[in-house]
Amino acid sequence: MEKLRVGIVFGGKSAEHEVSLQSAKNIVDAIDKSRFDVVLLGIDKQGQWHVSDASNYLLNADDPAHIALRPSATSLAQVPGKHEHQLIDAQNGQPLPTVDVIFPIVHGTLGEDGSLQGMLRVANLPFVGSDVLASAACMDKDVTKRLLRDAGLNIAPFITLTRANRHNISFAEVESKLGLPLFVKPANQGSSVGVSKVTSEEQYAIAVDLAFEFDHKVIVEQGIKGREIECAVLGNDNPQASTCGEIVLTSDFYAYDTKYIDEDGAKVVVPAAIAPEINDKIRAIAVQAYQTLGCAGMARVDVFLTPENEVVINEINTLPGFTNISMYPKLWQASGLGYTDLITRLIELALERHAADNALKTTM
């Protein structure tokens, strides 16, 4: 059987650049090399695309705090549409190896917000994960919450700040509506980038300023007292949910360093120590949230489980991490689907959706 060429797109002009490098390394290591050849398409912090050497594409690969994309001499350009050579060398115009399917693992801005997905759609390339609309909606916490709320799903009460209205909403108003503690977040960031826990007016002002450094829109959320539970969802039209896992914190909240740098900042418990009926309840809610937002391929649904066993949806991540400590692959492994088979299934789902899209009529 002829191998498929999988283009792994990673890195990116994003605050989550280093997380993406870690994810890409694990996917490259785990992919079924009897079925797939890998083409590494690295995006540096300036947004320039490169074709990377699979044997030597990372610096400090085993150090999450200092991992970096090794510079490459080959810059990449992409030709939209159905072409034999979709990728060309940007410097000399010569064709580069073709790819059959793209596995995007660019976390954060321009990677999981629909931007990259739109480019791949225009290029007529199959790709792993959700389409443009679902990616954009899940990236924007304000939009996510509105859609989940309209579907009757439980979310934390919140207020949305913009640069236009931020000075018209006082801390007293926010505290009156949401109470304390509060969580202040950039609307369009992941991995807890720019997120602050707030218990005072002074902290609130600092937190809002920080969040606006990363986005034009900021979410202020009521702090929910509860356990942090995560569930992995996989599939297109008939998605399946994994067993649940729990993030047990040793720090104040699940910040960026806790997730990716400080190995002692949190403990990942899979499966979560919850009653079977609660596990099933969360799995059903995760699938409902996934379908409400129109997700495809994969997503991780994060919820809070209150002491009263109320499930409050926190967020939906359409390109979850594949780092050494990432929950998504661990949840499927605990559910009987190993890392290599998970990657294979994600590629299959991408090809299935692309075939279905191409079967749609484009003329009257």
Swiss-Prot record:
The keyword Metal-binding applies. GO terms for molecular function: ATP binding; D-alanine-D-alanine ligase activity; metal ion binding. Mg(2+) 1 binds at D302, E315. GO terms for biological process: cell wall organization; peptidoglycan biosynthetic process; regulation of cell shape; response to X-ray. Its cofactor is Mg(2+); Mn(2+). Binds 2 magnesium or manganese ions per subunit. Mg(2+) 2 binds at E315, N317. Keywords: ATP-binding, Cell shape, Cell wall biogenesis/degradation, Cytoplasm, Ligase, Magnesium, Manganese, Metal-binding, Nucleotide-binding, Peptidoglycan synthesis. It holds the Pfam family Dala_Dala_lig_N. It comes from the Bacteria. Pathway: Cell wall biogenesis; peptidoglycan biosynthesis. Belongs to the D-alanine--D-alanine ligase family. PANTHER family: D-ALANINE--D-ALANINE LIGASE, D-ALANINE--D-ALANINE LIGASE A. This is D-alanine--D-alanine ligase A. It comes from Escherichia coli (strain K12).
